[in-house]
């Protein structure tokens, strides 16, 4: 039994299997249903989070990074981010040789990015508390993906504005150029305008002032993007003792140098194994998350100006940066990695190995895509003689506010009904709740037409069989036109009933924005503005690590 602490807040929740949610990968759905059946791709898979503790001896035996150097770096970066006493206590605990880490991570999104960032952090905290409740030393760590150079992806976030419609908030510093890691992007005065836009869209509540102060204190001009993200995360999760980690730190790069060197020397073996694993996955009917070409290399080159360039194997056996500005032999790359490890950053399939070399990682909480590419990166662990970390899916939520719960109830809907799309729900809503009299007349008309056409069909069949065939064609056309008219009736009724139309549109914007799960689109400021920082605690209390489905929380 997992002795997870329970709180005083009890929220109504429901669980929806991922198999019932559109656009989920086959590999992810099957992993959620039965991870042990996929042991060939996930050798450290467990049936339940309660089995994670059994991995602790193996994790500790394979962790050789200098804990004091690691924790010195972590202490400095967390103090810089305004760490709580509990976080600093956890860093002190991590110095002890029998302490393991429960890790998660995400890109440094604007104002924390999508909601699932919050859910990842709280998932790690919850499992940490489970392990501690069983007498194990464990700490939660959040790996900020500051090495990632896709700034476009993290520079914007979505909220619900005062009328309940979706609005995008974006920040674009003037000095942000292609291939620059997010951690080296510096905020300028444009962040003030972005904050003004955010609070111009959010409704004014009793919590708005507190939230604005929090955002303004953490997202400041002349602050690096990753640092701003770290400050806000530290504030939101300080009470939970979450440790933040920025991999751009030179001290961490030096600690990771042995992994870089070994990955470089074994790069050809890694690429061959990854390509073979991709073929194996595809042969089993799964999708390979990361495409691995023959020229693939597991590390990026970081230039003096900090820009990040992919390295590619050339036909003559050397390695060139994607822009062809630099060319190296394998021995040269290995020597540079040993002496100047800050010139490198790991690719997606190597990143987790670096993470688990630096940290005594007992478990990683990831999303569906991360679970998918772990099936590939497992080969990198094997080649580098590392035990593959157990990966669990982060907790997944849709938060339903009272007004949207009332709309669902009023029209007899569940969250999964929304996946068909708003327009496809119009017939059900119109005919059952708005105008069942006209709907009845349409049904009766179709029935009467079919009765009379059936009589005519019987008569024509005795005269000339081909006439009956002709009638069947015309019947389909008649019923098609009646159906088209009925569809226009549905649209007209919805348009005429403005209250219903607005209720449905705002519900879809809140629960399925841009036809995606809420957690993939909306930013946490929406809920912090309405409910204050209590919202973080409510989500934490709603976490159930035994539930591997998508959970619906009714506030």
Residue spans of the language-model regions?
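Low-complexity, highly charged intrinsically disordered N-terminal segments
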Residues: 22-87, 297, 481-486, 504
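N-terminal catalytic cores of NTP/NDP-binding nucleotidyl/phosphoryl-transfer enzymes
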Residues: 97-132, 366
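Glycine-rich phosphate/pyrophosphate-binding loops
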Residues: 114-115, 128-150, 389
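Short acidic, glycine/serine/threonine-rich loops at helix termini
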Residues: 114-116, 150-157, 255-260, 376
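A structural-propensity feature for long, helix-poor, extended segments
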Residues: 154-159, 163-167, 399-431
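A glycine-rich helix N-cap at a beta->alpha junction
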Residues: 158-187
